[in-house]
Structure formats: C-alpha cells, structure tokens
C-alpha cells in the first residue's frame, strides 16, 4: 500500500496526536494514529487492524532454526556505526552503515558483508501492512542519519546507533541543543530515556509496554516519579 505521507507530515495530525498523550500515567494500550484523516481523498484501509492493535499473537515456533542465532546475539549488537563529515566547500554528510554485520555472510575475500536486514520484515498484514516481506521491497529500517537546516543552510549533522532507540535518542539530542541551549558535547553526554512501548524491529518483533531504560545517575526523584506513573524503569550505566 502507498504510505499516507501528507497525512503523516500534517501539523494538524501532530496536534491531534499530542492531545492523546496521557501526562499522568503510562498508557500501555497506546495505538498508532490515523494519518489518513488528514490526507484528502484517501480512506484508511486498515481500520480493522487498528482495533486489534496490541494483541500479540503467538506465531513464533520455538523449534525454528532461528533459535540457533541466540549464541550470537551479543555480537549482533555491535552491528551499526555512524559517520558525520563536512568539507571546506560546505558539503555535509550523515551516514549510518548497518545491516547486522555479525553474524552475516562475507562476499568472498572482499570484506563486504551482505546485509541481513530482511529480518526486519514481518510475515502478517496485521503486524504491519506496510512492512510485509515481498519481492523487490526493502524492510522498514531503524537507521536515521539526519541533517538539520537553519535558514536553509546545514546546522547540525547527527546520527546514532542503537536499533529502535535511534529516533528517540536523536530527538532528545536535537531538543537538548535547540530548546535547552546545550552545546554538542553537553547534548551528547546528557542522559536519555528509551522506551520499548512499540513493536521491536528485530527478532520476534515483540514489545514491552511500559518498559523504559534510563541512565542510573538520574536524580532519584525522577526515577521515583516515573515508577509512580506505571513505568517499569530499568537503570543502566549509559543510554
């Protein structure tokens, strides 16, 4: 299906979604929005899927050969990096190479790894109708190399690794700079919060509604408040 790009980018749609945010408690039943309402002449063909969204179906076969992959999971997590570069002529690039380098197939002696991003596809329409595996199609990716412009000129080139946390960490980094007047170093070192509320892009595409990872040196009152709002808070050394 064709994505409702105009609806997704609509300011009216953004304002409608903001009104649905519960500022007092974690909403484990949060669902995707309906951008089709904000795109003229197009109806949403997936309303039935929205009604049942969040009801995970046990379709994974524990006997799948995929289970042998578990011994390599730690190495798999080192599969993404990022590069930001600019030259004297004003050209700026933001690149985030990825593809699950380990484990993967290397093309002969070239050192070129063949991407295994096809794991990010889903098999069933009700999981994500836009991301069902098909010939000639690329999967939904987590990669988000970014370039922010100010007055039509490059202002910040930025990106990060981290799977489904990439969009979250990049937004927090950007807001730290433009809203809270941090410099690049301060924004990079500031503590982030990562949510696992939505379906994962990897593995069995499961979700952990309410689970958030925070940096363990956050003020205790912040962690206490998050727990009081129904979150499962997981402190870590870095976020």
Regions found by a protein language model. Name each.
Residues 1-98, 107-110, 237:
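Internal maturation/activation junctions in enzymes
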């Amino acid at each position: 299906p064709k994505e409702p790009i105009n609806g997704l980018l609509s300011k009216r749609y953004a304002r409608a979604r903001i009104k649905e945010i519960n500022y007092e408690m974690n909403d484990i039943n949060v669902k995707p929005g309906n951008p089709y309402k904000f795109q003229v002449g197009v109806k949403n063909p997936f309303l039935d899927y929205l009604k049942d969204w969040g009801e995970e179906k046990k379709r994974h076969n524990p006997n799948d050969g995929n289970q042998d992959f578990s011994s390599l999971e730690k190495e798999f997590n080192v599969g993404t990096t990022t590069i930001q570069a600019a030259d004297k002529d004003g050209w700026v690039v933001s690149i985030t190479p990825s593809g699950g380098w380990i484990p993967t197939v290397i093309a002969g002696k070239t050192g070129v790894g063949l991407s295994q991003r096809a794991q990010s596809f889903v098999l069933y329409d009700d999981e994500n109708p836009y991301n069902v595996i098909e010939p000639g199609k690329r999967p939904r990716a987590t990669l988000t190399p970014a370039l922010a412009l100010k007055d039509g000129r490059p202002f910040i080139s930025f990106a990060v690794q981290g799977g489904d946390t990439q969009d979250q960490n990049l937004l927090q980094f950007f807001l730290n700079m433009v809203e809270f007047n941090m410099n690049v170093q301060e924004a990079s070192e500031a503590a982030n919060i990562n949510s696992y509320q939505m379906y994962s892009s990897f593995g069995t595409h499961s979700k952990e509604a309410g689970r958030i990872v925070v940096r363990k040196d956050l003020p205790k009152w912040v962690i206490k408040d998050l727990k009081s709002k129904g979150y499962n808070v997981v402190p870590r050394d870095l976020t």
